[in-house]
Amino acid sequence: MSVFLLMLILAVILFLYQSLTLYQPPLTQFISMNEKQSFEPFVEIDSKLSCYRPMLDAETISTTQPLKLLVWNVHKGEDKGWQSLLLNYEEKTDFMLLQEATSLQKLPQLLQRMPNQLFASGFSYRDMQSGVATLSLFSPQYYCSAAVDEPWLGIPKTGVSSVYPLDNGKFLLIINVHMINFEWTPTAYRQQLEQIMQQLEQRVDAVIIAGDFNAWNQERVEILQQKMEQFGLHEISFFPDNRLRFNDFPLDHIFVKGLKAISATTQKTKASDHNPMWVELAFD
């Protein structure tokens, strides 16, 4: 390799890293298009989580009506057609849990029936923030975010949790997560999963944990299944099942507690490298 080529490669790497900003803890924002709701920070569990509660009371969710959920890794909006797909689901969905969402997608403006967005970003590249986004009609009672760094890349993988009051006096916890990917021995993977499950120690009655779990080998699948079973969650099965697979293992999952599936489907699409999951749930 010539000295010139080596210097060129180093210059490109330096440029990329100078354009990259890492957020640890995650940069977390609540954006509402309908109301001027503000949140104040507080410590709910431990210092590993950044938590916020609203200045105003949140509206309750009905437990007599089905809860409809879309979960999708949107691949940073790099593929044609993602806007149309989200708009097609908007009318029949109460919550959208998106991974690899970005600030440039302007999701609250696009999805006017989903005016409330929680966005937890692990990094920004050239002023484009990227992370997980939870969109809904409902404002949370409180929310938390956390991240664990990818071992090889050092880029934080984020998760955001939100708690909603139910009309029966109980609470619903929703966790939207994008799990560690680039690691052969799943040390950081376990750490991130422990961080997620820690939140189930709080007083919640119904739980949804969903997202891109990057469970691409048998060891990761077993770690994931054991931890979910430990906390009483069960996995949703899909028909048809068109989830993205690696080594024949699906990467995307939905786990629930205190709810049961009425229907659960996936859709083939070219609007992302992942296919969306949609589920209709009833409270137990």
Predicted regions and their residues:
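Soluble catalytic domains of enzymes that build or remodel membrane lipids, polysaccharides, and related
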Residues: 78, 105, 126-128, 132-204, ...
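Active-site-proximal beta-strand/loop segments in catalytic clefts of secreted hydrolases
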Residues: 72-75, 99-101, 120-123, 136-138, ...
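Short, glycine/charged-enriched secondary-structure capping and boundary segments
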Residues: 83-86, 110-113, 189-190, 222-226, ...
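Structured beta-strand-rich core segments of catalytic domains in phosphoester-bond hydrolases
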Residues: 33-56, 95, 99-171, 267-268
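Boundary/entry segment of secreted carbohydrate-active catalytic domains
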Residues: 37-81
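Metal-dependent phosphoester-hydrolase catalytic domains
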Residues: 2-55, 200-207, 215-284
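A generic local structural motif
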Residues: 56-57, 81-85, 119, 160, ...
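Active-site beta-strand/loop signature of hydrolases that rely on acidic residues for catalysis
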Residues: 67-74, 84-108, 173-177, 196-221, ...
